[in-house]
Regions:
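C-terminal beta-signal and adjacent terminal beta-strands/loops
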Residues: 305, 374-394, 423-491
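Signature of Gram-negative outer-membrane beta-barrel scaffolds
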Residues: 31, 59-194, 321
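C-terminal beta-barrel architecture of Gram-negative outer-membrane proteins
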Residues: 347-426, 450-451
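Repeated loop/turn-to-beta-strand initiation elements of outer-membrane beta-barrel proteins
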Residues: 55-58, 141-146, 196-199, 247-250, ...
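Outer-membrane beta-barrel domain signature, strongest for Gram-negative TonB-dependent receptors
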Residues: 1-68, 73, 249-251
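Transmembrane beta-strands of outer-membrane beta-barrel pores
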Residues: 64-70, 139-141, 150-156, 203-209, ...
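Gram-negative outer-membrane beta-barrel transporters
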Residues: 138-141, 256-258, 277-386, 488-490
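Surface-exposed extracellular loop regions of Gram-negative outer-membrane beta-barrel proteins
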Residues: 107, 154-166, 177, 191-237, ...
Length: 491
């Protein structure tokens, strides 16, 4: 039906929704809501510099910040109805919790009209302070930088609604304050063999405060925090070299990075437990290493050839721990379960890439370019939940089903072909440029852009038995042949 462009499936029948609302006696059956995030970020920064001598400069300073995000639902359009009652509609038919429907016990049965807040209302706040010191050394051929940043952060939640499922301080008012000590250590050194040849090496170690939303199992209406949160640790090193010449400019980089103690949270429906759940994944570890190179070759005065390529390995290097709580009462579904993530590839980033582009810069501001790209060794983003004993162990009762839960799907290699035509108009102190860009010239409609594993599990009942298998991966696709016209003015 979707491929046939049946409007009953490709479009929303607004007239039918309004008709249903008008038959409900004023109470909305359907409505449009906005999920609002209001940001209020304040920062103070003081920086100073002292020249110790002609080659050494010391830079130091202090910074303060306060980041506050207020999140709530707001009624946009009641679609012809008069009001809606502020209750949790997911619990209306629940045999156990069907009598705990109020989204805000302090205003039970509240009537919501267009423009009113409802559902949830909370704020996440981060307060931080940091001291920094940097030393810059410069000579004719040698340069070196050393920097240290030491900070202190505090993260908390404040609920403005008292959820009936989680009365009192479980949802209303301030949560406990989680404190972290982030830091960053960086060192870099470079040597210029000549004005056209340069090499640099850099290394860094850091601890980063987790994202505020990842520190709570369900920040919409629950003050429950992740157990024993710690900063995410990062270690990285990079080697860069650059060569420039009258015909060819070349640069290459070799890199390695490792992150440890990552935290991720999400809400989902657990098919094995038959309940909505909140999940926290802790101890996530990743490793990235590889090399990349790029070259610009001036074929003639008007022709430029650009080449680039990269090869790397991006993978999970540790088995994280998974804790799952019921979304309705915080009861434990699975606690500190080991997920077999070690050795899985990181999704989203191709491990092999190549690009070639040729450009022509003609007279009177005319120009065109064409490019071809390749992305290979791509994988869907793996889900830690599927690789726990509760899912893969209990659900994968045969080797075939166990492999289906734990095997990571590889995406097909992707190729792109693009082109652009542009014209520039120069004025006395400004420039106007018009560009026509054509993306995906071949018109491929089935090029996979990215994907991730589903958290859902399907039941298979051959006779009296019940088997479990994972749902198929969710994939997004690149745009088909597309045309873009841009006009820019610089002055």
């Amino acid at each position: 039906a979707w491929l046939a462009r049946d409007p009953r499936y490709t479009q929303i029948d607004w007239d039918e929704l309004i008709r249903q609302n008008r038959m409900a006696g004023g109470h909305a059956v359907y409505a449009l809501e906005d999920r609002v995030e209001r940001l209020c970020n304040l920062a103070f920064d003081a920086s100073f510099a002292t020249e110790a001598d002609a080659r050494l400069t010391l830079r130091y300073g202090v910074s303060l910040r306060r980041e506050n995000t207020r999140s709530y639902k707001q009624m946009r359009d009641l679609l012809g109805a008069g009001y809606v009652t502020d209750i949790d509609r997911f619990l209306i038919d629940d045999d156990t919790y069907g009598n705990l429907l109020q989204n805000d016990l302090r205003h039970p049965g509240r009537t919501v009209r267009e423009g009113d807040r409802f559902g949830y209302d909370y704020a996440l706040t981060l307060r931080g302070a940091a001291l920094r010191l940097q030393a810059d050394y410069r000579s004719d051929r040698f340069r070196a930088d050393l920097s240290v940043v030491l900070g202190s952060d505090a993260v908390s939640r404040r609920g403005y609604y008292e959820k009936e499922l989680f009365p009192g301080g479980q949802s209303y008012g301030p949560s406990r304050v989680m404190r972290f000590t982030p830091y960053t250590l960086k060192a870099a050194a470079g040597w210029a063999f000549s004005p056209r040849r340069y090499i640099e090496i850099a290394a860094a170690a850091a601890a980063r405060t987790p994202r505020a939303g990842d520190l709570f199992f369900q920040p919409l209406y629950n003050n429950r925090t992740v157990d024993n949160p710690v900063p995410e640790r990062i270690y990285a090193a990079e080697l860069n070299c650059r060569l420039t010449g009258p015909v060819v400019d070349f640069q290459a980089a070799f890199f390695a990075a490792m992150t440890l103690d990552g935290i991720e949270t999400r809400t989902y429906y657990d098919d094995m437990a038959s309940v909505y759940c909140d999940m926290a994944v802790t101890g996530v570890g990743r490793m990235s290493c590889g090399a990349e190179a790029a070259a610009d070759i001036r074929l003639s005065y008007r022709w430029l050839l650009s080449l680039a390529a990269s090869a790397g390995r991006y993978e999970y290097i540790r088995d994280p721990r998974v804790t799952v709580l019921s979304d309705v009462d915080n009861s434990a579904v699975d606690v500190q379960a080991v997920s077999r993530m070690g050795g899985c590839e990181t999704g989203g980033a191709p491990q092999l890439t190549a690009l070639a582009e040729i450009a022509w810069f003609g007279p009177k501001g005319w120009g065109c370019r064409a490019s071809a790209g390749y992305a290979g060794r791509r994988y869907v983003e793996p889900m830690p939940l599927r690789r726990t004993d509760r899912i893969a162990g209990q659900g994968g009762i045969t080797r075939e089903f166990f492999d289906a839960f734990t095997r990571q799907e590889r995406l097909p290699d992707a190729f792109t072909l693009d082109a652009a035509l542009f014209k520039s108009f120069r004025f006395e102190r400004s420039r106007l440029t018009a560009s026509l860009m054509l993306r995906n010239l071949t018109g491929e409609a089935d090029t996979v852009y990215g994907g991730y594993e589903s958290l859902r599990v399907r039941r298979i009942r051959p006779g009296d038995d019940t088997l479990y298998a994972p749902h198929a991966s969710r994939c997004t696709y690149a745009w088909p042949r597309s045309f873009y016209l841009t006009i820019s003015y610089r002055f």
